[in-house]
């Protein structure tokens, strides 16, 4: 590329930066004026409102005046918010106005037009022509999808065809061109090398400048209700999904808001890691939660829900034996649709018998016993649904409570509590008596009426929580109804081996008030079938990350909970860590969906790690040969044979070397939290190190110790596998955990063993890693 072209491009950058500066100055001035107007409006709100309550017409006039003033204030606040958003985008553009250029000549046109692509659009000073096109604009799709030559894009007026004569990429920092490349179809390796060769961060970065064609298919898909993305570790699937969110918010900005979209992330740490991507693109963050928090909120306080990571920890630390086999058999069966069918049969059985009800009590007095409720319930016609019959029971119970309340308020304790009411309650009673014209100084029964009202107030307040519980059908003892499943004899059902042991274990946990993680969704499914629960219609798009860890039953539950939703489903079967996901269907299984509504895309190219780390890691998992490492070279992974007592000094030496190389994030990765705590105890007095736990919501640069199941989706400059021995990694179910740990490293990977190395390394060619012994 000739020097004069670079000079011309830099001159254009300078001109664009000047326009941005002028716009920032102009909007900042307007923003100050609008802000002052908002402050004045708030201060003088009631002075500008005409208040007159003498006549009905005056009341309406007052309401209209208040509404008008409130709408004026709301409009000013909205304008102020829009200006803030504009300023944020302009400030980002000022540093790096754009990252791409295409020259496109439409059919029947003589000249090509130069289109510059950035994270936001920018008009010229006269607001007539685009200086920068937003990367989400229809015309910008050609930058990601085509090489120079015939190309097209879909506009609102139909398909536009033409010829792309140039495709150019830029690296611009602080308004200066640092790199400039003319490229073919894919975003050029020179740009990717520059981006991927950088340091890891405690927050995920936007990939908008380096989106690949296959990622662009994910981002711009608008036709399929369920979009499944199976992507190798480091393939950019989560990044692409977040760019997809930004694209959809832009594309449907008149009908879709960020609070209409929800992201299920694997843990709070990952939520923090990705939290800066959407704001970087000028969009508000979507609603974020974890599946565990979502389920826990719906279960409520009646049961103590097991954390899924505690379930994983238990399975990984349990010795091989009958107890482990029973737990895993139970986890896998309860995740299946066969178990849901068993629950459906149980629900059908409950129409005839088996419902268990709680006593309705007040102040240790049984108003209606559970047995009496059961008799009433089963006396109703059984041709009705469970919910219809329960609603009739509810209405009957509310009548019984009302009758009880009327009797109970005559008791002495009610008057004693009435004497503790505050002055406002007495004033309210006086006002009510006056309104009924039942209060005057000349009558002798005023105090009786006052006492009756006081008693009524006290009783209504005390009985209100009970009435609310009855209205919510909480008189059903759902825990016991669910536990009864595990007391039944099953002859026609397909139950797993060890069913008797599974039943005993489940009964014991529920009797103690615990809900094992594998029972959470089945329990909620049964409970909500009995009590009825409306779906969430506000959320219109779900993004589910690490979908390989979701079972078919969990998918079915989410579909019912969010009936209007489209879903973007991301995962990698090679990174499955939960027992339910291994050797079973998961949310990534295409056949679980209506074939007319689903599309599955596969990302095979891995960008995170060096070629050496990926060549090593992909050999660990079946089918790993399909994964394509990005051509970025680095050191070979290193396996070190050491003693337990020698581990600390090796780790400290490696950390020093990482720092010397300029690395900023490095992790010691353990298989379990138990292992991580042991490592932390070993190192905490010798290095500045932080232990990451389930309660950790963010991490900073530096040295951390983290279990594999919390490191999912996160990347580090360098990673050390704390124990890669055969004693620690030998079960076939641990292969994907081992692979997940190895693929966290961007630039360097070290594996420590005291004793024989993991048999998983037998599948890796010795040319793909160094083997050293401590002291060599």
Residue positions per predicted region:
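Alpha-helical nucleic-acid-binding subdomain
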Residues: 249-542, 549-557, 565
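A structural signal for short, well-ordered beta-strand segments and their strand-loop junctions
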Residues: 101-103, 228, 263, 569, ...
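P-loop NTPase Walker
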Residues: 1-42, 189-315, 712, 740-743
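A positively charged, amphipathic N-terminal helix/segment that binds anionic biomolecules
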Residues: 171-172, 242, 358
């Amino acid at each position: 590329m000739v020097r004069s072209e670079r000079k011309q491009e830099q001159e254009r950058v300078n001109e664009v930066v000047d326009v941005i500066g002028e716009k920032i100055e102009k909007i900042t001035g307007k923003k100050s004026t609008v802000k002052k107007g908002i402050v004045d409006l708030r201060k003088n709100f009631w002075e500008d409102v005409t208040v007159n309550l003498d006549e009905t017409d005056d009341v309406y006039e007052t309401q209209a005046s208040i509404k008008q003033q409130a709408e004026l204030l709301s409009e000013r606040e909205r304008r102020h918010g829009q200006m803030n958003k504009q300023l944020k985008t302009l400030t980002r553009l000022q540093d790096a106005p754009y990252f791409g250029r295409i020259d496109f000549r439409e059919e029947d046109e003589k000249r090509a037009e130069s289109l510059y692509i950035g994270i936001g659009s920018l008009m010229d000073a006269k607001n007539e022509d685009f200086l920068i096109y937003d990367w989400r604009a229809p015309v910008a799709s050609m930058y990601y999808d085509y090489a120079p030559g015939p190309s097209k894009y879909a506009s609102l007026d139909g398909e536009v065809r033409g010829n792309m004569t140039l495709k150019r990429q830029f690296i611009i920092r602080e308004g200066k061109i640092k790199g400039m490349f003319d490229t073919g179809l894919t975003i050029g390796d020179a740009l990717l090398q520059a981006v991927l060769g950088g340091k890891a961060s405690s927050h995920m970065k936007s990939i908008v400048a380096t989106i690949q064609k296959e990622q662009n298919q994910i981002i711009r898909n608008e036709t399929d209700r369920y979009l499944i993305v199976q992507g190798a570790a480091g393939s950019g699937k989560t990044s692409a999904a977040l760019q997809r969110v930004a694209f959809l918010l832009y594309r449907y900005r008149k009908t879709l808001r960020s609070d209409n979209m929800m992201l299920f992330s694997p843990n709070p740490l990952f939520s923090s890691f990705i939290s800066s991507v959407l704001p970087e693109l000028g969009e508000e963050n979507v609603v974020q939660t974890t599946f565990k928090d979502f389920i826990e909120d719906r279960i409520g306080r009646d049961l103590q829900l097991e954390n899924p990571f505690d379930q994983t920890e238990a399975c990984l630390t349990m010795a091989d034996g009958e107890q482990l086999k029973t737990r895993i058999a139970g986890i896998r069966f309860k995740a299946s649709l066969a178990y849901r069918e068993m629950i459906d049969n149980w629900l059908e059985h409950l129409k005839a018998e088996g419902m268990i009800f709680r006593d309705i009590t007040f102040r240790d007095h049984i108003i209606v016993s559970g047995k009496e409720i059961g008799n009433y319930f089963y006396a109703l016609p059984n041709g009705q649904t469970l919910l219809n019959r329960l609603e009739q029971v509810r209405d009957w119970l509310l009548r019984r409570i009302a009758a009880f309340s009327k009797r109970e308020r005559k008791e002495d304790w009610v008057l004693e509590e009435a004497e503790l009411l505050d002055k406002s309650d007495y004033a309210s009673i006086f006002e009510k008596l006056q309104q009924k014209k039942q209060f005057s100084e000349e009558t002798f029964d005023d105090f009786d009426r006052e006492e009756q009202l006081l008693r009524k107030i006290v009783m209504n307040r005390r009985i209100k929580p009970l009435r609310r519980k009855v209205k919510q059908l909480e008189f059903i003892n759902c825990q016991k109804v669910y536990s009864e499943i595990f007391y039944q004899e099953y002859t026609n059902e397909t139950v797993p081996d060890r069913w008797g042991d599974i039943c005993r274990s489940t009964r014991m946990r529920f009797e103690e008030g615990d809900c094992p993680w594998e029972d959470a969704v089945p329990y909620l499914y049964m409970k909500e079938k009995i009590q009825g629960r409306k779906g969430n219609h506000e959320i219109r798009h779900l993004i589910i990350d690490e979908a390989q860890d979701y079972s078919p039953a969990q998918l079915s539950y989410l579909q019912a909970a969010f009936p209007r939703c489209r879903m973007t489903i991301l995962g990698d079967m090679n990174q499955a860590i939960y027992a339910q996901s291994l050797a079973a269907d998961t949310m990534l299984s295409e056949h679980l969906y209506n074939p007319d509504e689903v599309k599955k895309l596969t990302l095979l190219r891995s960008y995170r790690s060096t070629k050496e780390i990926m060549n090593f890691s992909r050999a660990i998992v079946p089918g790993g040969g399909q994964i394509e490492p990005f051509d970025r070279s680095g050191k070979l992974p290193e396996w070190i044979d050491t003693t337990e007592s020698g581990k600390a000094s090796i780790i400290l030496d490696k950390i020093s070397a990482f720092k010397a190389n300029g690395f900023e994030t490095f992790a010691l990765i353990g298989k379990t939290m138990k292992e991580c705590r042991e490592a932390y105890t070993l190192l905490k007095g010798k290095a500045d190190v932080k232990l990451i736990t389930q309660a950790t919501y963010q991490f900073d640069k530096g040295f951390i110790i983290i279990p594999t199941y919390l490191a999912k989706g996160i990347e580090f400059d360098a990673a050390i596998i704390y124990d890669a021995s055969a004693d620690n990694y030998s079960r076939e179910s641990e292969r994907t955990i081992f692979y997940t740990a190895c693929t966290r490293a961007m630039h360097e990977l070290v594996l420590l063993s005291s004793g024989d190395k993991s048999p998983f390394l037998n599948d890796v060619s010795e040319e793909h890693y160094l083997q050293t012994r401590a002291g060599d």
